[in-house]
Amino acid sequence: MLEKLGHPEKDLRIIHIAGTNGKGSVSAFLRSVFECAGLKTGMFTSPHLVDFRERIQVQGDMISKADTTRLGNRLLSMDFGVYPTMFDYCLAMALLYFKEQQCDVVILETGLGGTYDSTNACGVPDVTVIAKIGFDHMAILGDTLAKIAAEKAGIVKHGTALVLESQEKEAMDVLKQAAERADIKTTKVVNWDEIKILPQKDGKQCFSYAGYDAVTMKMLGVHQYENAVAAMLAAELFFEKYFAGKKNVPELKALQHAIREGIDRTQWMGRMELVSNDPFFLMDGAHNSNGVEALKKSLETMYPDEKFHFIMGVMADKDYGEMIRELLPLALDFKTVTVESERALQGEALADCIRAKGIPAEAYQKLADVLPDFSKSSAEKTVAFGSLYFIGEIKAFLQGKQ
């Protein structure tokens, strides 16, 4: 496809991101940092929550409906000699659009795995980031961390600079071997022990890392410290390559300020998103056991000794039993909903599974019946999770209500 389109990716400076959890947050942090540094930034991400066009953004703005239609019709009219998937078409559209928009930097998030992901056809990126690796999509990627890590490591290519988030030893060994095979000259590993978590500042999380003191961020959740640091390291590596040999290179202080400012400004829909303080309603896209573990840690840290009403919608191919088990110590009860997807687990079956673990659960047909009444004050705390598709449905519903 790219060959028939004239290889638009060859005119782009790319940061390639893979990982089971956190890659969307790392992408969002990077986009914000680059925009603060004055670079025109394209971002390709998936899935979307409410609008398909969320997948293709420049400077934080979605591709227009007119450009989506124009580029979509162009792609659909071409004979590629193969049968592209929707994801293939979407990526091709993104690359054409980013080239037209003359982006200085493009952030590409893998859709699934790495080795055989469509984004891996885009040549050697300036920087490659591997976020947290855990168990998900095991029928496709493999049933051990080592197998899953090997798929993610398929995006590590000779000539790129590499950033790794901390990993289980089994996964890290595979990633380091891949870096060695590709003869990677620069590898930076996020060291969790070097992240100093500070008291919140003006309602924002705050931390220090290496030369950066008291960095603030709106993004909530304990796991976001590491995602933020991964983005900071990736940005430093990209700036080093991007400004090499250029005239009028910004001072180091200015770039460091852009990194701090970008981390502070970052917002990302559906990730530990506090929709309302009173009544308290938070939603998170945690959709596998590792994601729910991170959600649990964040809730315990941010709201110690609190119990929650959980709203859950999940896909049938997920390890929903383990996801439920993680949250049992924090749960008052569960409300379940069937997500609008062929892959969804029926809400009643999910409620049965929860009740079998000794926690009250009830299945509902309509979102309106499970969400808090936002017109009334309440001390109760409600958290929705289980699937990004489910969070997208809630966002669309709330926007309709507003």
State each model region's role.
Residues 47, 90-140, 172-214:
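Extended acidic/charged loop-beta regions that coordinate divalent cations
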Residues 149-158:
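Membrane-proximal helix-turn-helix segments that form the acceptor-binding/catalytic region
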Residues 370-399:
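A glycine-rich beta-strand to alpha-helix segment
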Residues 165-187, 203, 280-281, 289, ...:
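C-terminal helical cap/extension that packs against the catalytic core
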Residues 11, 100-101, 105-110, 116-129, ...:
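Nucleotide phosphate-binding/pyrophosphate-handling subdomain across enzymes
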Residues 7-10, 36-123, 139-141, 169-170:
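ATP-dependent carboxylate-amine ligase catalytic core
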Residues 1-49, 54, 127-129:
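Walker A (P-loop) phosphate-binding motif
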Residues 44-47, 165-166, 178-200, 217-222, ...:
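Beta-strand->loop->alpha-helix junctions that form or flank phosphate-binding loops
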